[in-house]
Amino acid sequence: MKVTVIGAGNVGATVAECVARQDVAKEVVMVDIKDGMPQGKALDMRESSPIHGFDTRVTGTNDYGPTEDSDVCIITAGLPRSPGMSRDDLLAKNTEIVGGVTEQFVEGSPDSTIIVVANPLDVMTYVAYEASGFPTNRVMGMAGVLDTGRFRSFIAEELDVSVRDVQALLMGGHGDTMVPLPRYTTVGGIPVPQLIDDARIEEIVERTKGAGGEIVDLMGTSAWYAPGAAAAEMTEAILKDNKRILPCAAYCDGEYGLDDLFIGVPVKLGAGGVEEVIEVDLDADEKAQLKTSAGHVHSNLDDLQRLRDEGKIG
């Protein structure tokens, strides 16, 4: 099996290393426009393979020929918002990047599954879906696994328990409007509201929503370890056909009353990509929060269409 990672920056390289160390794929190919960057990082990873004990071959390239016949592609390419850059400028630029790399990749791998990591996540997943021409089950975004991981980490810290015993569910868009669901969160099978009072749970929820920004404030750049690990977990579920139940940005066509958008929902993830969108019962407040989150995603999609109509995106 072959996995392609587009973008050899911090997130892309971390994804590549995590997938290689899983030893599930025969080959991991990193693609980047910067000459020497993917080749050097790939060589470094190969030299670590005897120490970590994996046989996956990691290679780097500046063109898409070596990516042919990939089973999974993780798109990490994209720009962060820089000082002076408007939100429209960022959306336009990343749409061009994600759309362009998707078109180049799918020429040689028409039967692959695509995982999008680039931001704004929910919109970029839609862009990749359009550019690929793939069915909706073979395009998804990585957000829920990351955000849920952060939520689980904070709960484990609060209770001083192993993260392995914390299971959680989080839905909605990737950002401030995400919807953590404490009543679907358990520690060793015990519902977390029985272990943590409501006020403290709400504080943990708010920290989860701002977790990405917390890291940016500390380092001056965005996270890469947790996003890389999250994308690798999704990749493993697909390659192994594990039928994992994970929250992903998946296409909704009536599920949860949502239509024509990619948004975080629990899915069954296996060899067929998103094999099922799982609908759980939501109370009135949770439904309202999810509707608000979906409205934010639709607003971003409207902005995307406006920029296209204005000729700012090719």
From Swiss-Prot:
Binding-site list for substrate: 81, 87, 119, 150
One Gene Ontology term of the biological-process aspect is:
lactate metabolic process
Q: Function of this protein? A: Catalyzes the reversible oxidation of malate to oxaloacetate.
Residues annotated as binding NAD(+) are 7-12, 32, 94, 117-119
Q: What is this protein called?
A: Malate dehydrogenase
Q: Which InterPro entries match?
A: L-lactate/malate_DH, Lactate/malate_DH_C, Lactate/malate_DH_N, Lactate_DH/Glyco_Ohase_4_C, Malate_DH_type3, NAD(P)-bd_dom_sf
| UniProt xrefs under HAMAP family | Malate_dehydrog_3
